Amino acid sequence: ASPRSAQEAWTERGDAPIVITDESRLLIEEISIAARDSELVDQTSGVSARVAISAIELLASNLERRALTTGDHPVYPRLCDLPPLLPALTGKLEMVYEGEQQGPEVVARKLIGMAVRKLFEGRFPELERDVPANPDEPGPYAPILTWFAAGNAVTLSDEMPFAEYAAELARVPGLEALAAPLGGAPEQRAFWSELVLDGLHQSVKLARHDLDSTVSYKELLKFQLVKPPRRGPRRGTGEIN
């Protein structure tokens, strides 16, 4: 078994041991920081520590559910566990007028995206933003972007057994090489692999589509870069820009 830090908590919930990792706590804290810095959130009402506490409680419940449905033992957080945490944000944050116009869930997803991007930029190599995603792009992200440019896609879910989830991530060349230096258990490296994909999405290099409990990543087409801004979520779709 891999070593675990003192801050990393084992939580016994019934017969399903779960692990709330340092990186998942850090990401939730970054979401709280993004909320405290956001002009869309009413700062006069304060951003309570209960936001992070509530998010961790919801995360633990989601991990427990996955342990019971998949039989995985123990269960670790994934980035695709974040959508079920939206109630922790929408129910605890008060929006200013502009935030209310966009909708609490849209604002909450933006805060999550900001936190993911900050963690991505802090842990992984700098992304060459001005170079198009093509086979000649230099750097560690070239194999990943080239693979997606060939028409491939990845679909992940918080309901997948870990073996299936890890196998889906392993299809993407270059992903494991980026995540491996961060160490930890295989489940933790898979978390970092997924964070790379979402970091590339937040950096406008990949498209992401949400549907029910699944998250899909695919090539970002040029026409997707020039879509007009929307005031709120599009009805009937989980697409996130």
Name what the model sees in each region.
Residues 44, 64-241:
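C-terminal engagement/docking regions of AAA+ P-loop ATPases
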Residues 2-76:
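Conserved AAA+ ATPase small/helical "lid" subdomain
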